Structures are given as C-alpha cells and as structure tokens.
UniProtKB/Swiss-Prot annotation:
The modification ADP-ribosylarginine is found at R313. Residues 70-325 form the Protein kinase domain. This is Mitogen-activated protein kinase kinase 5. The gene is MKK5. Interacts with P.syringae type III effector HopF2. Interacts with BZR1. Interacts with MPK6 and MPK3. Interacts with RACK1A, RACK1B and RACK1C. Interacts with MAPKKK5 mainly in the cytosol. Binds to BASL. Interacts with MAPKKK20. It holds the Pfam family Pkinase. It catalyses: L-seryl-[protein] + ATP = O-phospho-L-seryl-[protein] + ADP + H(+); L-threonyl-[protein] + ATP = O-phospho-L-threonyl-[protein] + ADP + H(+); L-tyrosyl-[protein] + ATP = O-phospho-L-tyrosyl-[protein] + ADP + H(+). The modification Phosphothreonine is found at T215, T225.
Amino acid sequence: MKPIQSPSGVASPMKNRLRKRPDLSLPLPHRDVALAVPLPLPPPSSSSSAPASSSAISTNISAAKSLSELERVNRIGSGAGGTVYKVIHTPTSRPFALKVIYGNHEDTVRRQICREIEILRSVDHPNVVKCHDMFDHNGEIQVLLEFMDQGSLEGAHIWQEQELADLSRQILSGLAYLHRRHIVHRDIKPSNLLINSAKNVKIADFGVSRILAQTMDPCNSSVGTIAYMSPERINTDLNHGRYDGYAGDVWSLGVSILEFYLGRFPFAVSRQGDWASLMCAICMSQPPEAPATASQEFRHFVSCCLQSDPPKRWSAQQLLQHPFILKATGGPNLRQMLPPPRPLPSAS
C-alpha cells in the first residue's frame, strides 16, 4: 500500500518531525512483482473524437460497435448483478441485447474478463447466444449480445413430448458444443434458455457471468440458481470432493427439462424456498422422476440426466443419441435402444 501523500503546495505537519529513535525503522511489506501486472488497455480507437469514458474491448475492429451508436429501447430483464436492455444499432437498425453489469470490479477480475471475452466472441453455434462485443463505460461492464425476441423459457409448461424433445435437442446441441470447447456453463436453468420467434432455443449467460459469480459473496447468490445445482456441487463430500462441471451441467439440464414437462419445480420444495430446505431436498432425497404417465423414452431420458452418481450421468453428446431425442426426428426402432424392462416377480 502506498503512503498517503499531501497535495502539492500544502505542507505536511509530519514532514519536519524529528525521529526519536533514528536507529529504528518499520519493515516494508514484501511485494510480489509477478502480481504487478497493469490492466490491459483496449486497442486505440481509429477516431480521436471517441469519448475516453467509453471504450470497446475487442480485437476485431470491424465487428466492434460504438456504444454511442446503440440506442436503448426498453429494459427486458434485471437481477442483483445488473440489467439487460434491448438496444438498436442505429446505423443498421439491428436489435441487440445489452447486458449492463453493475459494480466496481477489481483489476484482476477485469483482466480475466478481457481474456474470457475473446473466447466468448469466438463461440459460434446456432444454439448458443452470440457475444458480439464488450464495453467498459464509467466503470460498468456492458456486454453486447444477440437479441432473442421471445425471452426466456422460465415458467414455460411444455407437456407435449414431441415439442419438448425438439427443445431438448437444441439445448443439448449447444451444450455439447460448449463442452467440446472445454467450456462449462455452471448455470443451466430455464431463465438462461432463450427462444426467438423462429422457435430457435439458445443457451445464454455463460462465461462472463460465471467469472463475476466467482467474485461475489456466495450469500448473495440467487436461490433460484442453487435450485438447479447438482448434489455434489452443493455437498462436495458426496463425490469425494471431486466436481465434474460437465456432469453438473447435465444435472441442471435434467431438472430444467423435467420442470418444463411438469409445469412446476420437480422437487418437493419450492424453487424459491429457503436454502436449508432446497439443499436437503437436492442432496438427501432421491432424484426426481418423470411421472408414470410419460413415455418410457422420456422417463429414461430424465433418469440419465438425474443420476446421483455423476459418472453414471450421460454426457450431452450421448444424450443427443438418446431415443427420446431421436424420436423427434422420427428414427426407427427406437425402443430397441432402451434397456429391457425389469422382469415381473414370479407368481410362485
């Protein structure tokens, strides 16, 4: 920590004070030079008239949008960490979503976000919301995202299995793509699954939101997010302290899909209940199951997602080949791919 210096022209009352013990001095704290890394600056703007308080963090200048060219239309979502606005890029009249993340973040967090944003900009999949750009404006981090005109799937009730299978296929396609790129979402839930008027479903809120969540007090985290966490993520003792983020994403997907089918949170407690009730329900009870009225394929699909033992869960890529998913495309002899039913007890 640097000592506080008096402003120029103002005499310090301590300046001419005589030292009673000149042979004594306070030890200076050790400073690790490896930590003295300056915050990376954005690339210089091609126009000298650009405002200094707003800059785009981007290496692809042709894809960058100036923040001054974005006109806010209305607020489309908000939470503890920030607000999402629908904006229009005035030169092209193209709509985008602008996520404004509040808070003064430490330099280390900003450096990490700068590195992560380049990864997010390279993500290109029809079932993943595209990250176009990022701005640092007056201390606020603002992320320019693809606009999904129908919003999130939170509160959706999708009881028709054909429609639910197609929706699941799209989510799994995006999730398998992220996993192949070694990206773990860590927050799959209905509010992070967006849909547009063309019925395209896309995964949102990964990457930067994950980094920021790591810097926040866990006591300030959303209970709704806890509701979709896997048991071993909440209680690390369940899997000997090992956490597989890919398997955790699959669990969260399974809870979300079952919630769509039932039209309610699938556990015996409220999704917005207290932490203790949620954690007991998730970690100590049996995983929820699809009702007996559902098809055999769907019941098995949910079971493959919601295995208590993480290694027994199917991967996103494997689930894409599950009979419930293939049924949406009309694949033949799908029941032959399911395990045989349990034998009935003998009458003797």
